[in-house]
From Swiss-Prot:
Cited function: One of the primary rRNA binding proteins, it binds directly near the 3'-end of the 23S rRNA, where it nucleates assembly of the 50S subunit.
Matches recorded under PANTHER family: 60S RIBOSOMAL PROTEIN L3-RELATED, LARGE RIBOSOMAL SUBUNIT PROTEIN UL3
Protein name: Large ribosomal subunit protein uL3
Organism the protein comes from: Pyrococcus furiosus (strain ATCC 43587 / DSM 3638 / JCM 8422 / Vc1)
InterPro entries xrefs: L3_arc_euk, Ribosomal_L3_dom_3_arc_sf, Ribosomal_uL3, Ribosomal_uL3_arc, Ribosomal_uL3_CS, Transl_B-barrel_sf
Gene3D superfamilies cross-referenced by the UniProt entry: 3.30.1430.10, Ribosomal protein L3, domain 3 (4.10.960.10), Translation factors (2.40.30.10)
Family, as annotated: Belongs to the universal ribosomal protein uL3 family.
Disulfide cross-links: none
């Protein structure tokens, strides 16, 4: 019998397999685009269903009806509340300054009304609880305009090389939770001036998913995967079960290494943390964008995307949503971030919504 070569099924490229630092995923690389728009969006995973659609991609099934599993991500409007400016430092980009809008009341926040007491007024900064840049106690509109003017001068002098939008989610709009996630998004464009003007126009306002993304385009999905806790090497690394007459365990590694070097190598498959890892999945197609929990199939037909009995462990989709082809990492209700594809294939599907002939809204219970 020849030499049996069976490497582990798990990649060492993801080691060490430990828990993500934050449940809010980070994005370190951005695509280069000439169109001036925010490069991505964020939402909450509602669940999966399936559709029938006319295939518009080149291939054997082009023009035919195909089955497609899809993930529904609910995307309540993001609130743009700041600008972060970068300059080129010795080791690369470094933060030059930040401009945050003055505090404002949240009219759509579901504050509880207690007996005999007036309804409490929730403001944006009170909700964030110090999760933004430190601000003076009496941060007025005049101070905000002064800082904005200083940033404009820095851009004109050529000191600033990039500007990005600081945004916050609004999960209370969909009755999911109260505390928002704060994150940063790059802006497409050819010059710093046009990027700055885009954010300046949106400051303090809400941004909907339909204003940012296009139906049919390819996206990269960034999320923290489902946590599995401590698992053994068979499930964690996909090693083979040992033979029937092997001693001292069956779901173990046969050998953890040679006598010398007299230490256990880091490459040996071991038990440990599995899941709750930060992962990016490339080139997921955005099939459709819906509004207020409804998907428009044609001029006369509009359906509720929520299946009978609601999405399991999630409930009803009330706001805007994205319908993305295939599965998406992460648990139900978890924050999911997307960006335009950074490494799209040579043969890209057309940037338009494919013709959807059927959407399953049967119970998923």
């Amino acid at each position: 019998m020849g030499k049996v070569h069976r490497p582990r099924r798990g990649s060492l490229g993801f080691s060490p397999r430990k828990r993500a630092k934050s449940i809010v995923p980070r994005i370190r690389s951005w695509p280069k685009e000439t169109e001036v728009r925010m490069l991505g969006f964020a939402g909450y995973k509602a669940g999966m269903t399936h559709i029938l659609m006319i295939d518009d991609e080149p291939g054997l099934t082009n023009g035919k009806e195909i089955f497609m599993p899809v993930t529904i991500i609910e995307t309540p409007p993001l609130r743009v509340f700041g600008i972060r400016a970068y300059r080129m430092g010795y080791l690369g980009l470094e933060t030059a300054t930040e401009v945050i809008v003055p505090d404002f009341p949240l009219d759509n926040y579901p504050a509880k009304e207690r007996k005999g007491k007036p309804k409490p007024k929730m403001t944006f900064y009170k909700l964030l609880e110090r999760r933004i840049a430190t601000l003076p106690k009496n941060y007025t509109q005049e101070m905000f305009e002064q800082k904005l003017g200083q940033l404009e001068d820095m851009i004109k002098e050529g000191e600033i090389v990039d500007v990005r939008a600081i945004v916050a989610t609004q999960p209370w709009v969909i009755k999911l939770k109260k505390k928002p996630e704060v994150m940063e998004y790059a802006i497409g464009g050819t010059s710093v001036e046009e990027k700055f003007n885009y954010i300046k126009e949106k400051l303090g306002k809400e941004l909907r998913v339909g204003e940012v993304l296009k139906e049919g385009e390819l996206l990269d999905v960034i999320a923290v995967t489902k946590g599995k806790g401590t698992q053994g090497p068979v499930k964690r690394w996909g090693i083979k079960l040992r033979a029937h007459k092997d001693s001292k365990g069956r779901r173990k590694v046969g050998s953890i290494g040679p006598w010398h070097p007299a230490r256990v190598m880091w490459t040996v498959p071991m038990a440990g943390q599995m899941g709750f890892h930060h992962r990016t999945e490339l080139n997921k197609r955005l099939i459709a964008i819906g509004e207020n929990g409804k998907l428009k199939l044609d001029e006369n037909t509009e359906i509720e995307i929520t299946p009978k009995g609601g999405f399991p462990h999630y409930g009803i989709v009330r706001s805007d949503f994205m319908m993305i082809a295939g599965s998406v990492p992460g648990a139900i209700k978890r924050i999911i971030r997307v960006r335009p594809a950074i490494r799209p294939p040579k043969k890209k599907p057309p940037v338009q919504r494919p013709q959807i002939t059927y959407v399953s809204v049967e119970s998923k219970q």
